[in-house]
UniProtKB/Swiss-Prot annotation:
It comes from the Bacteria. Belongs to the GatC family. InterPro entries: Asp/Glu-ADT_sf_sub_c, GatC. GO terms for biological process: glutaminyl-tRNAGln biosynthesis via transamidation; regulation of translational fidelity; translation. This is Aspartyl/glutamyl-tRNA(Asn/Gln) amidotransferase subunit C. It comes from Chlorobium chlorochromatii (strain CaD3). It catalyses: L-glutamyl-tRNA(Gln) + L-glutamine + ATP + H2O = L-glutaminyl-tRNA(Gln) + L-glutamate + ADP + phosphate + H(+); L-aspartyl-tRNA(Asn) + L-glutamine + ATP + H2O = L-asparaginyl-tRNA(Asn) + L-glutamate + ADP + phosphate + 2 H(+). The keyword Protein biosynthesis applies. Signal peptide: none annotated. Its EC number is 6.3.5.-. Heterotrimer of A, B and C subunits. Allows the formation of correctly charged Asn-tRNA(Asn) or Gln-tRNA(Gln) through the transamidation of misacylated Asp-tRNA(Asn) or Glu-tRNA(Gln) in organisms which lack either or both of asparaginyl-tRNA or glutaminyl-tRNA synthetases. The reaction takes place in the presence of glutamine and ATP through an activated phospho-Asp-tRNA(Asn) or phospho-Glu-tRNA(Gln). It is an enzyme of class 6 (ligase).
Length: 95
């Protein structure tokens, strides 16, 4: 299978792309090189090789849900740079 300039023109129109004539020839050559490489992969003997669905086994990386005591207001505000009563005090943002 090979790609022609007509094929590249059609694909470019679908993708709403515009190429000059030299770019069309470059794209045609590059696509043909890619297809040639893929055809070489078809020549590889894969008899007896198990198909892979992915490289890594899925692993649950979440920790167990453990109920902890909530922090008190004073513990939460302990390191606050500025506070007012039980609230964080921040600089005025909107005029």
């Amino acid at each position: 299978m090979s790609v022609t300039i007509k094929d590249v023109t059609y694909i470019a129109e679908l993708a709403k792309l515009r190429f000059s004539e030299p770019e069309m020839e470059t794209m045609t050559n590059e696509l043909n090189n890619i297809l040639h490489y893929i055809a070489k992969l078809d020549e590889i003997n894969t008899d007896g090789i198990q198909p892979l669905s992915g490289i890594y086994d899925p692993v649950n990386v979440l920790r167990e849900d453990v109920e902890l005591q909530p922090l008190t207001s004073s513990e939460v505000l302990h390191n606050a740079p500025d506070r007012q009563d039980r609230f964080f005090k921040v600089p005025k943002v909107i005029g």
